[in-house]
Amino acid sequence: MKVANIGSPLESRIFQTNGISLHVILAGPANGKPLIFLHGFPEFWFGWRAQIDYFVSSGYRLIIPDQRGYNLSDKPAGIVNYSIDLLAKDIVGLLNELTNSKAFIVGHDVGAAVTWYLIAQYPDRFIRATILSAPHLRVLIKHLVTNPAQLGRSWYMFLFQLPWLPEVLLHRNGWELLLRVLRNTLPPAVFSDSDFERYQESWSKAGSLTAMLNWYRAPLWYPSKLKFNPEGSRARVPTLLIWGKRDSFTGETMARESLAYCEDGRLEMIDSATHWVQHEQPARVNTMVSQFFA
C-alpha cells in the first residue's frame, strides 16, 4: 500500500480484538521495536503520516490502528460500546496478537486518553509512553468543574452529549462545521486540500460520525473505574508529555498538573504549536519522542 507523501511501504490489515475488527496500518521491519500510535478526534491512522517515515527509518515496527468507531474499523452501535475500558482492551488485544514484546506508545487527544489508561492499568505491556495534547482524566474533570475558562474551551464536549443534533450540525453543508473547527485551530497550510478530502472520506463511512461522538458520550454514562481511584490511575511507565502553548482546547496548567499522575514524567512545551503538535512541528515532536524512547 502506497500513500502520497509517505515513502515507507505500508501494510493494511484487519485484526480481531476484544470482539471487534480493527483496521491497522503496519510499517517498518517485522523484527523492529514495537511502537503503537493512537490517533485522536476526528482523525484516523492517517493522522500520523508525518511520523511514519521517521520512525520506520529509526528501526521501529509501527502499529497504527483506526481505533474503534473510526474509518475502516468496526463501529458497534450503542454508547456502552465506547467506554474507555473497552477502548483500552482493544489495544491490549491488538498488541497480544502482534507481539510478545513490550511496546512503546504515543497517543494524541482522545488517543492519549486511552494511552493514559493503558499505562496505568497495563504497565507490563509498555516500555515508555508519549502523551500529546491531552491531560490526565482527573485533571480534566477538575478543570471542567472548577475552571470557567476550561468550560469554554470544552464547549464541544457538552454539545456532543446531545442525541442526533451534533451529527446534523457536523455533517451538514459538506462537513462545514467540522472542517471549520480544524482550520480555525491549525495554522494555514498545515493540512492540504487532499488531506481534508481524506478526512471527509473517513467521516462519511456508515456509522462513523455517531461512533466518533460516542467516545465523548460514554464517559458520562459509563465512567472509567479510574475516575474514582487516584492511585490506580497513575502512569506507571516513564511518560513524556508534549504540549503546544497555543492549544485552543487544553491549557498549559492542565499539562503541568498532569505530571502529578506520573511516577516518572516530564513535560515539553512547544511555544509556537497548537493542539495539533505532531502536524505543525513534526520534526521537533519526532526528535523529542525518539530521544525519550532511546
Placement of each model-derived feature along the sequence:
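Short, flexible hinge/linker loops that cap or flank conserved catalytic cores
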Residues: 16-18, 28-30, 35, 233-235
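C-terminal alpha-helical cap of glycosyltransferases
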Residues: 24, 286-290, 294
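Catalytic histidine-centered segment of alpha/beta-hydrolase-like enzymes
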Residues: 273-282, 286
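Flexible "cap/lid" subdomain of the alpha/beta-hydrolase fold that forms the substrate-access gate
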Residues: 1-13, 20-22, 63, 70-106, ...
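A short acidic, amphipathic alpha-helical/loop segment
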Residues: 50-51, 254-257, 284
